Structures are given as C-alpha cells and as structure tokens.
Design a protein with these regions (language model features):
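Short catalytic/metal-binding and nucleic-acid-binding patches
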Residues: 1-174
Length: 174
C-alpha cells in the first residue's frame, strides 16, 4: 500500500453520506498567505458557488483566510474527497491563470468533520465566519470580504458595510 497522508489515513473506512453536514478545511501549500490578495480569495469562493450550482453541496458557511479555508456544507452528491479534489483543482487553475503561478496552491489532503444532527449549526457558522476577527485581520466582520453564511450571522456588525463588499457576500441569504 502506498504511503498516505495522515488526513487520508483517517478517512480509510469512512464514507460520505448524502445530506450529511460536514466541516471541510484545507491549507495552502507551506501555509503561504496567498489569499491576502482578496481577488485571489474570490477565485476560491467562486468554486464554492460552482459546487453548489452543480448540485454537489449546499454551502452553509465559509471563510477564506489568507492561508486556508473553512467550508461548512451539506453534501448532496459524490464524496467529500471528490468535492475537495474538484474545488482545489479548479481554484488552483483559476489562481494560476490569474497570477502566472506554476507551483502547487494547496497542501495535499484536507481535514473534515461530520457533524451530528444535534450540533448547533448557527453557533458553528458564527465560529467559522468569525475567523478573521480572532486572527486579528479586522475589527469588524463586515470589513472582511471573504466569507458567507446562510445561518444566523446577520447581527455580527456587518450590514452597513455589506453593500460595498465583493460579490462573495450575498446579504439576501443572511
């Protein structure tokens, strides 16, 4: 058997369940802060929308940080591994096309966690989108453009600023 990364070894024997909620996280290669460039972060966010439009997942909350992303999804079709492979591949192509990069964008593998139905999704969505605040990137969440949530985050001091944010934020969904 070939050597597998720790995250891939953890998935041996596990399966992806349709309509189950998962928190997916992955890091950039060597934790480079590629998405400090907001435009490049938007290219990743657009792949979340593509996955949703193609019926692979419903995005419940996500944030693109300078060197990683967190994505809370309801899996609709395929497996988590297929979804992440597709998202990472397409976002790599988009970023490389935009920047002329030739190197890997992402670390291999990803972290995933299946949520229990009784877990508080609103609390988790708030935790995810508050990452930029905890990291000290902004003072108000509304000042950070690379996040979205359809669950209970409308009161995190963002609405006056939201109309000026990038197309990554759809306040009608909050």
């Amino acid at each position: 058997m070939r050597d597998l990364s720790a995250s891939n070894r953890l998935r041996i024997g596990r399966y992806s369940e349709q309509n189950r909620i998962y928190l997916l996280t992955t890091n950039t290669a060597r934790r480079q802060p590629v998405f400090s460039d907001i435009e490049l972060g938007r290219l990743v966010a657009s792949q979340f929308r593509v996955a949703e439009a193609m019926g692979f997942a419903n995005s419940l909350a996500w944030v693109v940080m300078p060197d990683h992303f967190h994505w809370l999804i309801e899996l609709k079709r395929g497996s988590r591994s297929e979804l992440m492979q597709r998202t990472k591949s397409l976002s790599t192509k988009a970023v490389n096309l935009s920047t002329g990069r030739k190197t890997s964008l992402w670390q291999s593998g990803f972290h995933d966690r299946a949520l229990r139905r009784e877990e508080d999704l609103v609390k988790l969505a708030r935790y995810i989108v508050a990452n930029p605040l905890r990291a000290g990137l902004v003072q108000k969440l509304g000042d950070y453009p690379l996040w979205d949530a359809i669950l209970g985050c409308a009161d995190i001091e963002l609405l006056p600023f939201a109309s000026r944010l990038a197309p990554t934020l759809d306040i009608r969904r909050l």
